[in-house]
């Protein structure tokens, strides 16, 4: 980077953050993000992960810089804080309209706006469970038919950044495997990964780029000898004795249960004390974090959620023995900025269940000595090797998103589906989180003793609280409720419903949550419900749209989208445009035309694609073919007409229901997704001059033949799963945009 560009980048960073960048950050802006970046705790990893990429994307080398940055963090609280910080940077730089910013963590992960603008430069900040599950085509708190869109975008034109590697667990190996599979199988546009670490370099990631910037602050190491039989009480007394009046003491414990107990003991002793962990509603979490910034003479008791990214420093740190990388992160919260020139104290103890012997030996050898961040970073402590991530065969098996049971919803709305029965080949939990880290999302509402009312809104946004699945599963039967995906009614959750990312309701009168303590399953105190927020205004199609018009408009949108995205080979570009032009041919089927006209006055003649929503909601209708999928008919027409297999697949896949495996739903057999063998379709003539004659549909051999053809596309070396999903995404986005041309607020909902 020339001196002029270096000065320009310094101005860029100062405008965003108010601080001058460290030299290593300027180097990243000049050379691009490396594979591995090692920076001491407090050395500016977040700035290094975001602003050099942003500068290269918008200023110096946009054509060589992936258009999406995905910043993956291990905790919801860290993701929230980072999301706010990055938003402030974009606002100060005047880029909020040019660069999208989205949060993929907790309940916010269900917001899918980032999928609708694949051509826009964007930043996704998320937790590893929500992001990696989507990269494996099994997104937590996501709707299965939307999975190919998330997958296609995350594996295309994306710069991944994984922070705090020591907290990723199995997700670290998964992230490495996914990058290697992208390199091996190919993507539509370059996709890269940077891993950042504050400690030693993980094996197999190559040579690290070393960053510096953290002050050479001092911490003195000392051991606390606590009796295992009275551990919590002794630890509480030790914290009280170690606290220096007028300063902050930070206590990091390995167990949420022990953190609750020590917090309660300190509070009972009259100490000013805050409890921080991962299981708070958003507003309460933000309030507590703000309280830590405004106080100095207090104690913060935390779980390992504090290790990563939280901008918090204390004069005294009390920590349980933990793996070395975690210990280094925790020590980084002691005298973090050198605000105590005399140094801080790191006091460690062995929990009742024991700890890592190698870490204990290093700490014992440095008893009473002052250590710096550089010494901690340079230490060589052997740590367990994480289990391997998914292989090629696993990745290919996950590409099939067909439900393994008949319980998924067939609605095209973006809502939760009922649980699928996953086979070992397609379950992804083991590649993402330790079992103890899996969470569901819970909201508390007040309702009648019989349960939630039929019109009770779905939980969303600020009222949702992540809850450990293990503790949720211990609640009495009938405590948790969810909306059934098939009939839309609230019902008690079954054990199979308690899955990562599930959205559940609990009765506020039964307790389980305290605003200053978060998820507290043994608390009987009624929970003050958090406002669910205003319901979204109802939108829908406000005019009749003919089939020919919709197909042409979708092809037009595909042209526009392709013009704004990286150059694809001509054959793939043509396949996307043709699939967009043909995707809804199956709407010519009588079952769909009858559905569009049913209950609506004065429908026009001719084949329709969209119906006009009037001033009043329609009465409920019972479809004669409840599982009907028009895109299956599109596939049958194109296949029988001898069209290109890729075009046929992309047209069929445009709602995410007809992709690899196609089977009857519920009790509909011998129908197949609402289509009967021998059904007739009328002739279709498009304004382009293309004609599709009337046909008799045959479905007897379709499922097996279709799966074989779809798998051949997935396994084609010139396509592969990543490119194929990206092409699916382009057709779907073009369809959404053409439909949006005719959408508006429905007056009856205002």
Say what each PLM segment does.
Residues 129-133, 138-188:
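SF2 helicase catalytic motif II
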Residues 2-38:
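Conserved pre-motif I regulatory segment
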Residues 33, 45-64:
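Walker A/P-loop NTP-binding motif
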Residues 65-89, 108, 129-130, 256:
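Conserved Walker A/P-loop ATP-binding site and its immediately adjacent core
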Residues 237-244, 261-271, 275-290, 294, ...:
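C-terminal helicase lobe and adjacent C-terminal extensions/tails of nucleic-acid helicase motors
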Residues 93-141, 145:
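Inter-Walker segment of RecA-like/P-loop motor cores
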Residues 358, 364-365, 567-750:
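Divalent metal-dependent catalytic cores for phosphoryl transfer on phosphate-bearing substrates
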Residues 190-192, 196-244:
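Interdomain hinge/linker at the junction between the two RecA-like core domains of SF2 helicases
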């Amino acid at each position: 980077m020339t001196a002029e560009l270096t000065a320009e980048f310094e101005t860029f960073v100062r405008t965003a953050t108010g601080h001058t960048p460290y030299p290593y950050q300027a180097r990243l802006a000049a050379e691009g993000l490396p594979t591995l970046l090692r920076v001491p705790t407090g050395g500016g990893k977040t700035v290094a992960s975001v602003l050099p990429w942003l500068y290269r994307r918008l200023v110096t080398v946009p054509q060589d810089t992936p258009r999406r940055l995905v910043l993956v963090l291990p905790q919801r609280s860290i993701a929230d804080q980072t999301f706010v910080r990055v938003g402030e940077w974009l606002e100060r730089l005047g880029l909020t309209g040019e660069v999208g910013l989205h949060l993929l963590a907790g309940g916010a992960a269900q917001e899918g706006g980032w999928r609708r603008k694949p051509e826009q430069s964007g930043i996704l900040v998320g937790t590893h469970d929500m992001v990696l599950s989507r990269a494996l085509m099994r997104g937590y708190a996501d709707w299965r038919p939307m999975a190919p869109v998330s997958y296609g975008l995350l594996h295309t034109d994306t710069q991944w950044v994984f922070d705090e590697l020591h907290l990723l667990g199995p997700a670290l190996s998964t992230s490495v495997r996914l990058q290697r599979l992208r390199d091996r199988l190919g993507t539509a546009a370059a996709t890269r990964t940077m891993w950042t670490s504050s400690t030693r370099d993980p094996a197999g990631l190559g040579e690290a780029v070393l960053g510096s910037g953290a002050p050479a602050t001092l911490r003195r190491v000392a051991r606390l000898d606590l009796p295992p039989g009275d551990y919590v009480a002794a630890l509480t007394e030790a914290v009280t004795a170690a606290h220096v009046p007028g300063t902050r003491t930070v206590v990091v414990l390995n167990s949420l249960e022990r953190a609750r107990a020590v917090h309660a003991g300190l509070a009972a002793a009259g100490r000013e004390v805050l409890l921080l962990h991962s299981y708070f509603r958003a507003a309460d979490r933000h309030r507590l974090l703000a309280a830590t910034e405004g106080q100095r003479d207090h104690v913060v008791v935390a779980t390992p959620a504090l290790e990563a990214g939280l901008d918090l420093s204390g004069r005294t740190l009390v920590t349980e023995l933990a793996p070395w990388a975690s210990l280094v992160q925790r020590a980084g919260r002691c005298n973090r900025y050198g605000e105590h020139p005399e140094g801080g104290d790191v006091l460690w103890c062995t929990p009742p269940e024991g700890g890592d012997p190698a870490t204990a030996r290093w700490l014992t050898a440095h008893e009473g000595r002052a250590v710096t961040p550089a010494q901690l970073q340079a230490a060589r402590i052997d740590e367990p090797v994480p289990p391997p991530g998914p292989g090629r065969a696993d990745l290919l098996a996950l590409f099939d998103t067909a439900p393994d049971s008949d319980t998924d919803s067939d609605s095209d709305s973006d809502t939760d589906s009922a649980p699928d029965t996953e086979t070992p080949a397609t379950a992804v939990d083991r590649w993402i989180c330790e079992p103890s880290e899996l969470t569901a999302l819970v909201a508390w509402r007040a309702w009648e003793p019989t349960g939630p009312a039929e019109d009770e809104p779905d939980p969303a946004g600020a009222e949702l609280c992540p809850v450990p699945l293990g503790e949720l599963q211990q609640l009495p039967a009938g405590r948790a409720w969810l909306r059934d995906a098939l009939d839309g009614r609230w019902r008690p959750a079954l054990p199979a419903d308690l899955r990562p990312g599930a959205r559940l309701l609990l009765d506020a009168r039964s307790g389980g949550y305290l605003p200053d303590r978060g998820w507290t399953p043994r608390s009987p105190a009624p929970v003050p419900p958090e406002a669910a927020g205003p319901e979204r205004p109802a939108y829908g199609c406000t005019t009749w749209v003919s089939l020919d018009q919709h197909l042409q408009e979708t092809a037009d949108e595909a042209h526009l989208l392709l013009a704004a995205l990286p150059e694809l080979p001509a054959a793939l570009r043509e396949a996307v445009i043709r699939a967009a032009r043909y995707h809804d041919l199956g709407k010519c089927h009588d079952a769909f035309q009858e559905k569009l006209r049913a209950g609506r006055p004065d429908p026009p003649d001719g084949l329709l694609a969209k119906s006009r929503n009037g001033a009043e909601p329609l009465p409920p209708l019972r479809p004669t073919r409840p599982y009907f999928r028009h895109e299956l008919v599109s596939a049958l027409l194109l296949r029988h007409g001898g069209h290109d297999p890729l075009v046929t697949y992309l047209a069929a896949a445009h709602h995410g229901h007809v992709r690899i495996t196609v089977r009857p739903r519920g009790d509909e057999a011998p129908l197949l997704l609402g289509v009967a063998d021998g059904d007739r379709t009328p002739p279709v003539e498009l304004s382009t001059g293309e004609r599709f004659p009337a046909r008799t549909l045959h479905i007897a051999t379709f499922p097996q033949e279709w799966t074989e053809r779809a798998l051949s596309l997935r396994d084609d070396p010139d396509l592969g799963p990543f490119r194929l999903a990206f092409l699916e995404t382009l057709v779907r986005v073009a369809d959404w945009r053409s439909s949006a041309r005719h959408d508006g607020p429905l007056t009856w909902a205002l």
